Amino acid sequence: MGFYMLLTVALLLTSFMSVEATPVDQAERSAMKESGLAHRIEPRYASCEAAEADCIHDDCFSEDTYTDVCQESCQYMYDNCMDD
């Protein structure tokens, strides 16, 4: 009898662990929009051309001069400007 109680408790605990946090994330995002915090976060680049100018700069091709700006601009291009 004790084994079945332990098994039931274990199954209940594992079922609670598989709950997704999507509704919580959506609630947080809507709260941020209502409070105005979402509008304060602006992307670094307004266009792909600006990101491309930073990404293909000569400094970004050298390991010694590669900076966070190079990383951010090339990542922006990869995420937003590449054709599928």
From Swiss-Prot:
Its main location: secreted. GO terms for molecular function: toxin activity. GO terms for cellular component: extracellular region. Expressed by the venom duct. Residues 22-39 form a propeptide. Residues 1-21 form the signal peptide. Disulfide bonds join 48-70, 55-74, 60-81. Keywords: Disulfide bond, Neurotoxin, Secreted, Signal, Toxin. It is found in: Secreted. The cysteine framework is IX (C-C-C-C-C-C). This is Turripeptide IX-01. It comes from Gemmula speciosa. The lineage of its organism: Eukaryota, Metazoa, Spiralia, Lophotrochozoa, Mollusca.
